[in-house]
Amino acid sequence: MKLTEEEKGIFTYFIPVKGMEEQLCKALTGVSERVEKGSETCGGNLIIQGGQGCGKTMLSTSIIKVLQQKTGKVDGRVGKIDATILNKKDIASMFSKIEGGCLIIERAGELTKNAAVTLSLLLEKDKKGTFLILEDSPKGIKKVLSKDENFAKKFTETVDVPIFTNDELISFARSYSRELGYKIDDMAVLALYNRISKIQRLNQATTLTEVKEIVDEAIDREAHGGLRKAISILTAKRYTDDDRIVLTEKDFE
């Protein structure tokens, strides 16, 4: 199975990651069945697991967008909530507000047993294709699935967001800057590799969030470049042929 070109565009940040397209195809197939059949299928809810800052919520929202296009469903509200807050809510009342839509539960490992049981029962009664996405680290996901067996059975689809290689982080940075109307030139890419190497730690992977912050900082520097910016405007080097603003090596130093 492969994603369409349009779907690849929606998942542009993640497609360069080895094995991600296959994971997404499998997950979309299972979740589509849940969305279309509702309580007629016991599974089809989704787990997205990975480290902090790896883009889990970004991936969740992209999956929802693709599902809306593929199925014409997910026409209810889409909500996002931290598990510790959800534990204190009237879960049945909240569920009724997102019927036919989706609820993204962040830090899902913090769900209480009572919350897990309640959500499981609500999913069993649901007729409108409401589905849930659990987000957490692998440890947090293991923790929440141990709370209630019936709840765990509802989550048959999983996407693992792996540790990004430096090349994949650079690919993300390029895609992110492109969406904002910028282009990272070749010398700037080398400077970005250098910035990434400086923040890498032995016991913790560099995250998409950290790389996003580096690009945001470069964009801010470009926008307030003073004399250098004035010269680049005069020499017409500030824009690409498709009118994107060029980020240079200096912007990343």
Task: State where each predicted segment sits.
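Walker A/P-loop
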Residues: G43-G76, F155
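AAA+/P-loop NTPase substrate/partner-engagement loops
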Residues: V66-I98
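Conserved catalytic/switch belt of AAA+ P-loop NTPases
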Residues: L111-A152
